[in-house]
Amino acid sequence: MQWEVVIGLEIHTQLSTQSKIFSGSATTFGSEPNTQASLVDLGMPGVLPVLNKEAVRMAVKFGLAVNAEIGQHNVFARKNYFYPDLPKGYQISQMELPIVGKGHLDIPLEDGTVKRIGITRAHLEEDAGKSLHEDFQGMTGIDLNRAGTPLLEIVSEPDMRNAKEAVAYVKAIHAIVRYLGICDGNMAEGSLRCDCNVSIRPKGQVEFGTRCEIKNVNSFRFIEKAINSEIQRQIDLIEDGGKVIQQTRLYDPNTNETRAMRSKEEANDYRYFPDPDLLPVIIEDSFLEETRATLPELPPQKRERFQSQFGLSTYDASVLASSREQADYFEQVVSISGDAKLAANWVMVELGSLLNKQGLEIDQSPVSAEQLGGMLKRITDNTISGKIAKMVFEAMANGEGSADEVIEKRGLKQVTDSGAIESMLDEVLAANAEQVEQYRAADEAKRGKMFGFFVGQAMKASKGKANPQQVNELLKAKLEG
């Protein structure tokens, strides 16, 4: 039987506010346990929550960025459940009236196409604390520093049909929240976590299959692996005569398997009701327009502009627009070098490789956009060849200065004097007279391979400094003359 996969995602983004959503406690990551937990965060009797306006602004900003309806009358609700790191016995969240309603996001896929993914809603809520099992023998420690940190939970429609589409969607959300400056997107620190809802159904069937939710997956690679593992588990289970049970599962990267945590709860299990300590939130038109005016150019628009303005492919434009820092770096390189396609290639390939090796982000690059743009300018004006450029790039990465300084210091300027190149070629051909005779006696098919030999000898003789295009043209004329 052929199966169709149905995937919906819930992405929890930790908002980059200075203080928590309902208290004045700081949100700094990595502080000593329980040093950033106020009486409100601890759930002490008699204290009242006060809503952080900046968290509301950030949520509205996201809603506008994904073409969503904004709930101008939205309500906070209590989500009731017991867990040791939830001191109040309930989480303040939103249920019937979220701050962000239906929207959509167009995501670029690997094959160059673009797919529209629906967004069901995005709601504000407070994060829970953290249970620490590894640091204690026979007991669990509770760190409430995270309790009350503002979260925006972004719920997608079940529009994804494979793990790669799911990863592309998460990457698109990741890029948008970073562009907006509302979340740092640090998945290793838990700033962006993903719950993956996965089900399968026979191809052509309209009704959804029974879904399972994989909780708290915190890397793009693990999202893909967890979803693929769960898809295979469900297919194997059904084809062996079993039945998928709706449940919450965890992904174990060591075994590349998902394992059951508990049966999946429904909304009524949490006994949601409006929080009596918080008034409804009324968002005025003026607040909406003021927030809309602060929106930057977002990845989808930047991607389209890179394609139309610079003639880049969908893939190249998507990669370069994937982070605000990378897009800004690329545009600065283009403004200096004047060659967008050459700049795109160097930023994605050579610079990307360097940053990966050194474990750096682009805003930590040892080669500045000004340096790279200056070097590319020397390629386009024939001062250096592409091969020599790699040597110059390496030298710049090692702190040897600008491209011009490296070229001057190392004597790497390309030879473009046709007289000097002709003289050098005459010496090369004289030293390889036998091969010249063989070339002239050979047919066209063999000549192609033999020509490469002469080019190699010429570049070796010039220590890589001769202009390759001139070498090719003059060499061809001499061999066939």
From Swiss-Prot:
InterPro entries per record: Asn/Gln-tRNA_amidoTrfase_suB/E (IPR017959), Asn/Gln-tRNA_Trfase_suB/E_cat (IPR006075), Asn/Gln_amidotransferase (IPR018027), Asn/Gln_tRNA_amidoTrase-B-like (IPR003789), GatB (IPR004413), GatB_C_1 (IPR042114), GatB_Yqey_C_2 (IPR023168), Gln-tRNA_amidoTrfase_suB_CS (IPR017958)
Keyword check for Ligase = yes
Highest taxon of source? Bacteria
Q: Which gene name belongs to this protein?
A: gatB
GO MF annotations for this entry? asparaginyl-tRNA synthase (glutamine-hydrolyzing) activity; ATP binding; glutaminyl-tRNA synthase (glutamine-hydrolyzing) activity
Q: Which reaction does it catalyse?
A: L-glutamyl-tRNA(Gln) + L-glutamine + ATP + H2O = L-glutaminyl-tRNA(Gln) + L-glutamate + ADP + phosphate + H(+); L-aspartyl-tRNA(Asn) + L-glutamine + ATP + H2O = L-asparaginyl-tRNA(Asn) + L-glutamate + ADP + phosphate + 2 H(+)
What role does this protein play? Allows the formation of correctly charged Asn-tRNA(Asn) or Gln-tRNA(Gln) through the transamidation of misacylated Asp-tRNA(Asn) or Glu-tRNA(Gln) in organisms which lack either or both of asparaginyl-tRNA or glutaminyl-tRNA synthetases. The reaction takes place in the presence of glutamine and ATP through an activated phospho-Asp-tRNA(Asn) or phospho-Glu-tRNA(Gln).
Query: Quaternary structure?
Result: Heterotrimer of A, B and C subunits.
List, alphabetically, the PROSITE patterns matched: GATB (PS01234)
Keyword annotations: ATP-binding, Ligase, Nucleotide-binding, Protein biosynthesis
The EC number on file is: 6.3.5.-
Q: Which SUPFAM superfamilies match?
A: GatB/YqeY motif, Glutamine synthetase/guanido kinase
Q: Under which name does UniProt file this protein?
A: Aspartyl/glutamyl-tRNA(Asn/Gln) amidotransferase subunit B
Output the GO biological process annotations, alphabetical, semicolon-separated.
Answer: glutaminyl-tRNAGln biosynthesis via transamidation; translation
Query: What is the similarity comment for this entry?
Result: Belongs to the GatB/GatE family. GatB subfamily.
User: NCBIfam families, from UniProt?
Assistant: gatB, PRK05477.1-2, PRK05477.1-4, PRK05477.1-5
**Family annotation (Gene3D superfamilies):** 1.10.10.410, GatB domain, N-terminal subdomain
Q: What is the lineage of its organism?
A: Bacteria, Pseudomonadati, Pseudomonadota, Gammaproteobacteria, Pseudomonadales
